[in-house]
């Protein structure tokens, strides 16, 4: 099997002979504060990142208090001190879709790529023209209908494999 060598994300060539593509994974570390999100974009650029990446999800579509409470260890060590439920925390700290235009403009101003990890196809609404690549989280590696839809968008896909096994990655 042969593979095409290299591709571009914006103006940056991604290839084995090139410098690594540095993604600042801001995710939800803005703590639900758009000003903090903007500050993190500028900090990412100052740190030498090529890209500022966020996560776009809606809490009610990826977490459930019922699901977490049914686990033997419903409060993992880092969640034991939370005063709110897992679903409430996710809802509070998600990247709000109404922030998209501001985040995209801030990335342009900082001269850094904007990227996201969408957790549903609707997350791409309104930002498809502003991303030059899409990152898929490893938890979605076996979510075939989602991957097929994303692959039809015509953008390079960075597919995480951390929460998968070898069979997941080759099928």
Report each predicted region and the residues it spans:
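N-terminal amphipathic alpha-helix/helix-capping segment at the start of soluble metabolic enzymes
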Residues: 1-23
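Hydrophobic faces of well-ordered beta-strands that scaffold small-molecule active sites
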Residues: 22-24, 52-54, 114-117, 134-136, ...
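Conserved, mostly hydrophobic/aromatic
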Residues: 25, 44, 127, 160
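Active-site beta-loop-alpha junctions enriched in small/polar residues
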Residues: 27-29, 57-59, 119-121, 139, ...
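Active-site-adjacent beta->alpha loops and helix N-cap segments on the catalytic face
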Residues: 34, 97-100, 136-154, 158-171
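Catalytic domains of carbohydrate-active enzymes, especially glycoside hydrolases
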Residues: 39-58, 130
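Glycine-rich, proline-tolerant flexible connector loops at the mouths of alpha/beta enzymes
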Residues: 50-94
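Active-site beta->alpha loop and helix N-cap motifs at the rims of alpha/beta catalytic domains
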Residues: 78-144, 152
């Amino acid at each position: 099997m042969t593979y095409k060598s290299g591709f571009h994300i914006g103006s940056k060539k991604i290839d084995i002979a090139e410098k690594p593509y540095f993604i600042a994974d801001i995710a939800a570390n803005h703590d639900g504060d758009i000003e903090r999100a903007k500050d993190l974009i500028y900090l990412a650029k100052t740190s030498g990142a090529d890209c500022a990446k966020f996560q776009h999800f809606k809490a009610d579509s990826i977490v459930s208090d019922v699901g977490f409470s049914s686990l033997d260890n419903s409060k993992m060590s880092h969640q034991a001190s939370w005063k709110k439920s897992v679903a409430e925390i996710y809802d509070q700290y998600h990247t709000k879709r109404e922030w998209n235009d501001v985040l995209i403009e801030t990335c342009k101003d900082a001269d850094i790529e904007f990227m996201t990890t969408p957790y549903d196809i609707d997350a791409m609404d309104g930002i498809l023209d502003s991303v030059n690549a899409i990152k898929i989280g490893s938890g979605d590696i076996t979510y075939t209908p989602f991957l097929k839809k994303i692959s039809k968008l015509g953008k390079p896909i960075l597919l995480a494999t951390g929460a998968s096994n070898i069979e997941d990655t080759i099928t």
